[in-house]
Amino acid sequence: FIEEALKGFIIDERIGMVSGKILRSDRITLDSTGLFLSLWRTAKERGYGAKDKGQFEKEGYVFGVNGAVAFYHKAMLEEIKENGSYFDANFHFFYEDLDVAWRAQRFGWKGYYIPRAIAYHVRGGTARSSCGIDKPYARIYLSDRLHADLIKNRYLTIIKNESDFGFWLHFPAVALYDFVMWGYILLFRTQLIKPLLLNWKFLKSAFKKRG
């Protein structure tokens, strides 16, 4: 994996993020073939949950790379670091890889996918309960604290990286997504409201980090 992945950095001097085809532990289910930014401003793993049938065998540019097995160019990390840190300590869990990718894109860096570099990832092995490992619909298996982190970190990522133009362009999609999400919270996960309110203190810091 390492040998193949590192070849990506010699293709273009502005490639700062490289990863390969990430499979689940069953070695046939795709976990990620590149990280992308969705219209509703969530992290989108290309190929997530699909069976590997050779549909992602073409290497090429991607928005970012999954943090499970990511290679980052040191020059890129040095250029995009915030307050001396590469990763935002306020995130705790989730969205760090999208935050890094979005920051890197704003600075003119690129991500690259190499399908010959194959790795295996136990999805949820760190954050989920044992019954949720390698299962879809991650939110179901998260503790309340981690679920709150997931929601909070999406907002922090948007605040830090979205341009004014991008905000208004994607506002309808984001508003629709948030309407559904908050409806779910109010109906089924009301216990998330308190930790989410406690997390609002991080918003001020995020606004200060806007590029």
Q: Model features per residue range: what roles?
A:
Residues T29, T42, A50-A75, Y86, ...:
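A recurrent flexible, glycine/aromatic-enriched loop bordering the glycosyltransferase active site
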Residues S163-G211:
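Non-catalytic, C-terminal membrane-associated alpha-helical segments of glycosyltransferases
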Residues E4-A5, D99-R103, N153, D178, ...:
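Alpha-helical elements of Rossmann-like donor-binding domains used by nucleotide-donor carbohydrate transfer enzymes
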Residues M17-S19, Y113-I114, L169-H170:
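A structural signal for short, well-ordered beta-strand segments and their strand-loop junctions
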Residues E3-A5, F63-K81, S85-G125:
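A short, conserved alpha-helix in the catalytic core of glycosyltransferases
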Residues L98-K160:
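Catalytic donor/gating beta->alpha subdomain of glycosyltransferases that bind UDP-sugars
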Residues F1-T42:
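Conserved donor NDP-sugar-binding/catalytic core segment of glycosyltransferases
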